[in-house]
Amino acid sequence: MKTKKSKSTLWFWLIILLAIIVTIIIIAVTVKGTTQVISDATFADWMSKSPQIDPNADKYWKNVIIYYGSNNTVVVKGSYFLESTGKYVNFVAYLTQKRFETIMADKPYPWPALVYQGSVGMALLVSLAPLLIYVLLFGGIIWFMMKSSSGAGAGAGNIFGMGKNRARAEKSDVKFANVAGIEEEKSELVELVDYLKFPAKYAEAGARAPKGVLMEGPPGTGKTLLAKAVAGEAGVSFFSIAGSEFEEMFVGVGASRVREMFNDAKKSAPAIIFIDEIDAVGRKRNNGMGSGGNEQTLNQLLVEMDGFGTNSGIIVMAATNRADVLDPALLRPGRFDRVIQVSLPDIKERKAILELHAKGKKIDGSVDWYRVAERTPGFSGAQLENVLNEAAILMVREKRDIITITEIDEAIDRVVGGPAKKSRAMTKQDKDIVSYHESGHALIGLKLDSASKVQKVTIIPRGNAGGYTIMTPKDETVFSSKKDLFATIAGYLGGRAAEEIMFGKENVTTGAHDDLDKATNIARRMVVQFGMSSLGMTKFLTMAEESYGKMEGTYSDETAARIDAEISKILEESYKIALKIIKENMETLELLAESLRVLETITAEQIEYINVNKKLPEEVLEQKNRMAKEDEKIKKGEIIDIKVEDLDID
């Protein structure tokens, strides 16, 4: 029994074949109607004239073919240029073989003639050869488009596969055991697995299973992995598609794809439909007139999720980074009954994720995963996986047998700032500036109770940064107080403050531009979002969407000026705090800067040693002695044989 899909494909090819036949008939009739039958005398006259003008030219004769017809008849067909009309005329001449030989008289043909000793059908085939070539070329293009569309999962129901469902059923082999660090989110989804396995139990209790689950969170937190784990645990079909795949250049295609996707899921029920980046298709509908393709697609999705039809056994899961831009009709109960926040992992969750991804890798048993988790605040699960992958690559590059904390530490730096640029030339002045700048950041972290803890300081360039300081929160809390935010801003401004104190206000460099950007962003949020300024407990929206998609500000120019003044006030107060701390701890600043100049990178343990003992660590003193001896040899003109493996390079 033929399916609806195969029938539509058959009709498509029948229409194409009919169009080709009609085209051939029209061309044949047109050619036949304009062809003149000439006598042997006319043919002889044309043959006697054209060679006299230019026997080697192909000006007068075109597309001439000669073939043998019935009863020893010679048929000559082609086009001849008439000087009287200035145009070519299509002709056909029927000659006896003897008459043809008399006219030609053993002369060379004045045209590139084609002689066929065969049937009339063969000659007709040759005459239609150019047309057949075009037909085959056209058919090949159609076949290629059909093949491509079908291979891409678009189906072959129409010429481009538009409107066809791009999601295909697959069985997921991911389990909850493959997902680490988001235990609360997993517990929310256990009920879905139970419903998909035992739907009758919920029906007897009169309970309705959630029709949809929306997962919101930053990129790389495991939203897609969770959806696959639900399908894998339940053992049901898993349909996945990106929100952008619904749309095409033609209006209505997205709605058609939504319908077919749900129809396919019904055939495979129980099933899960997962829509990644649903904000691409589920954005809020504006108040403007008209109904574009996006709105049609959204409307169809709303109907399929909770309309007149029934989609029993189908659960829609979706992921987005921007739930705030989704249409309210999409978020109501009955469509997405549950909205799960998948946030960035905390320190314990990061430790669990690292341990999960460490399986199957050769890692030194002395690696403390809790310490590694401390160094990676704000990292997503995807970034943590990338850290261990980079560490494995470094192990192979360095031709080592196991991954040590050295490779992991370097991998974290590579993920944060990119590969180190040790070959970048840096003058002594630049090195001094960067050393004091980064020491300023570290000093604020050491002396301010609310500031972040310093984990590492380096002056080795990475990316666009001449150096950087890694600081992590002392305690990973959910909320931040006004005091905490002031301390964070002071930490960002500590580098600029150190430059001003050491080199003067007029010699402050551009190295603090990124610090200023981050500090200003926090200060602005304190004013316009958190109500932490003299403007009071008011949230100022910078832009608002009005009717017909028009965007307008929500406050006056006078208020904007007051907001800018408050931001400047917060930055100035934080900068004064940074200046005060650095001036009171100049000895520690000098020791930190000297350690950076010598080692280029100092760890949390070395920083704490300097802060407590007010002297340089042993590693710094040893390196200074080696450098002094080498300088002495250079002054004496001695040749120094330095091997790469002898250099103290991290």
UniProtKB/Swiss-Prot annotation:
<protein>
    <recommendedName>
        <fullName>ATP-dependent zinc metalloprotease FtsH</fullName>
        <ecNumber>3.4.24.-</ecNumber>
    </recommendedName>
</protein>
<comment type="function">
    <text>Acts as a processive, ATP-dependent zinc metallopeptidase for both cytoplasmic and membrane proteins. Plays a role in the quality control of integral membrane proteins.</text>
</comment>
<dbReference type="GO" id="GO:0006508">
    <property type="term" value="P:proteolysis"/>
</dbReference>
<feature type="topological domain" description="Cytoplasmic">
    <location>
        <begin position="1"/>
        <end position="10"/>
    </location>
</feature>
<feature type="transmembrane region" description="Helical">
    <location>
        <begin position="11"/>
        <end position="31"/>
    </location>
</feature>
<feature type="topological domain" description="Cytoplasmic">
    <location>
        <begin position="145"/>
        <end position="650"/>
    </location>
</feature>
<feature type="binding site">
    <location>
        <position position="441"/>
    </location>
    <ligand>
        <name>Zn(2+)</name>
    </ligand>
</feature>
<dbReference type="InterPro" id="IPR003593">
    <property type="entry name" value="AAA+_ATPase"/>
</dbReference>
<keyword id="KW-1003">Cell membrane</keyword>
<keyword id="KW-1133">Transmembrane helix</keyword>
<comment type="similarity">
    <text>In the C-terminal section; belongs to the peptidase M41 family.</text>
</comment>
<feature type="transmembrane region" description="Helical">
    <location>
        <begin position="124"/>
        <end position="144"/>
    </location>
</feature>
<feature type="binding site">
    <location>
        <position position="437"/>
    </location>
    <ligand>
        <name>Zn(2+)</name>
    </ligand>
</feature>
<keyword id="KW-0472">Membrane</keyword>
<dbReference type="InterPro" id="IPR037219">
    <property type="entry name" value="Peptidase_M41-like"/>
</dbReference>
<dbReference type="Pfam" id="PF00004">
    <property type="entry name" value="AAA"/>
</dbReference>
<dbReference type="InterPro" id="IPR000642">
    <property type="entry name" value="Peptidase_M41"/>
</dbReference>
<dbReference type="GO" id="GO:0005886">
    <property type="term" value="C:plasma membrane"/>
</dbReference>
<dbReference type="InterPro" id="IPR005936">
    <property type="entry name" value="FtsH"/>
</dbReference>
<keyword id="KW-0547">Nucleotide-binding</keyword>
<dbReference type="InterPro" id="IPR003960">
    <property type="entry name" value="ATPase_AAA_CS"/>
</dbReference>
<feature type="binding site">
    <location>
        <begin position="217"/>
        <end position="224"/>
    </location>
    <ligand>
        <name>ATP</name>
    </ligand>
</feature>
<dbReference type="Pfam" id="PF01434">
    <property type="entry name" value="Peptidase_M41"/>
</dbReference>
<dbReference type="GO" id="GO:0008270">
    <property type="term" value="F:zinc ion binding"/>
</dbReference>
<dbReference type="GO" id="GO:0004222">
    <property type="term" value="F:metalloendopeptidase activity"/>
</dbReference>
<keyword id="KW-0479">Metal-binding</keyword>
<feature type="topological domain" description="Extracellular">
    <location>
        <begin position="32"/>
        <end position="123"/>
    </location>
</feature>
<dbReference type="GO" id="GO:0030163">
    <property type="term" value="P:protein catabolic process"/>
</dbReference>
<keyword id="KW-0645">Protease</keyword>
<dbReference type="GO" id="GO:0005524">
    <property type="term" value="F:ATP binding"/>
</dbReference>
<dbReference type="InterPro" id="IPR041569">
    <property type="entry name" value="AAA_lid_3"/>
</dbReference>
<comment type="subunit">
    <text>Homohexamer.</text>
</comment>
<feature type="binding site">
    <location>
        <position position="515"/>
    </location>
    <ligand>
        <name>Zn(2+)</name>
    </ligand>
</feature>
<keyword id="KW-0067">ATP-binding</keyword>
<keyword id="KW-0482">Metalloprotease</keyword>
<keyword id="KW-0862">Zinc</keyword>
<dbReference type="InterPro" id="IPR003959">
    <property type="entry name" value="ATPase_AAA_core"/>
</dbReference>
<dbReference type="GO" id="GO:0016887">
    <property type="term" value="F:ATP hydrolysis activity"/>
</dbReference>
<dbReference type="Pfam" id="PF17862">
    <property type="entry name" value="AAA_lid_3"/>
</dbReference>
<keyword id="KW-0378">Hydrolase</keyword>
<comment type="similarity">
    <text>In the central section; belongs to the AAA ATPase family.</text>
</comment>
<feature type="active site">
    <location>
        <position position="438"/>
    </location>
</feature>
